[in-house]
Structures are given as structure tokens and as C-alpha cells.
């Protein structure tokens, strides 16, 4: 079980969109639920991410744990990511929200160049492609979602970052092309055929635990994360980050 929480894998996922021309693609690295994991070889992970050469890097919350006393390990991760690409976007998770020094942590990462986009949206141009990168806070309400997407250009590809996969679903509509989230840890402990036994916010045998979920014109993707909470245990569920490629087919 120790290797399940210390030796990471890269989960590659491909999505397609008619909002990009054929032969165009957007490369994304998603990191979620790191929980200040000191067991991971960060130098190796940075090397792997650099070789992937992502266009943007997204952090979908719980990068620290609510028990984290020293932010040094996580700040080192953040600085390493910024050296690879300055396009790093972040939304808070419940552990940042719960931490007694959570606001201090958020203020610092913003100061060093991390783009915090809780209830906000950034319009960016990546290699000629116009993209909306939006985010919502963990305890979102409809007004928060509307604030995040109110000024998007509907003909541009829109990514929504949300720590929780299930909380925004009652609000999300076709304005959003791709939702990237975490929070579930894939259940941490999984069983063959059954999948996740339990996930926060969903209880036993969750509907949304990890992977890809088509939702009409929107797609939800849940990364199972790089860390653990409560107990340092994973089973049939190795820690990971995701390499996401959005390919054009217009």
C-alpha cells in the first residue's frame, strides 16, 4: 500500500472539440489533492511534467492538508510548476478553506504568481487559441457560478475548475465544455468491479468517483489526486496527476 501513495502515475486523457481547428490541441496538466504529500519524489514529478510541456497547469484544490503545519513542501511544488509554465491556475479546496492559515497560504501563492480563480474567469490565448479558464470556490452557490461564467465568450472553449465534482453540477450548463475536479481521491480504497467504496460529499458507492463523465454538451473529469486524507492509505488506486489533451476537430 505504501507504493500506492508514494509512486505516482500519469493518467492521460484525450477530449475533442469543434471549437479548435483540426491539428490544434491544448495540453493541460492537472494536479489535485496533493495534501502536502512528502512521500512523492517531487524532482521526478517536475521532470515528467516538464517533458510533457503543458500549455497550462491547473490545480484543483486541497494542495495543502488542513493539518499542514509547514507550507515549505507545497510552496516548493508551486515554484517548480511556475518554472515550467507561468500559466498556473488554482481553485481552493475544503482543506485550504478549513486551514487556520489558509488565507495566508493563498495570499502567498498569489504573490509568487499563481492565478487564483475562485468565482472568476480568465480569458487567455494559448498558441492562437482563445480559451476561457473559469473557477468556482468549494462552497459555491448559483450566484458564484454565474459570477464565474457571466463574461465568457460562448464560441471559445471553456474550462471550469471546481474542487468538488458534484457541487457545481446543479448549475452547470452548455456554456462549459469541460469541468476539471478532484476531491474524491477516487475513494482512496477501491474494489474490483465495485470501484470507490465512499467519497466525501457523496457517501457510499459514489456516482462520481474518478474518470470521465459525459453530461450532455459538458464533460466532467475527476482526477483521483496525489495525496491522502484521514489515513495515508490507498488500495487499487495509485496516486496520480493527469495529462489532458484537448484536440480540435473543426
List each language-model region with its residue ranges.
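N-terminal membrane-anchoring alpha-helices
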Residues: 1-23
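Conserved beta-sheet core of the metallophosphoesterase superfamily
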Residues: 165-243
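Membrane-embedded segments
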Residues: 21-115
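Binuclear metal-dependent hydrolase catalytic cores centered on His/Asp/Glu-rich metal-binding motifs
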Residues: 100, 106-107, 111-114, 121, ...
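Short, flexible loop segments at the rims of nucleotide/cofactor-binding pockets, characterized by
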Residues: 33-38, 65-69, 136-140, 157-158, ...
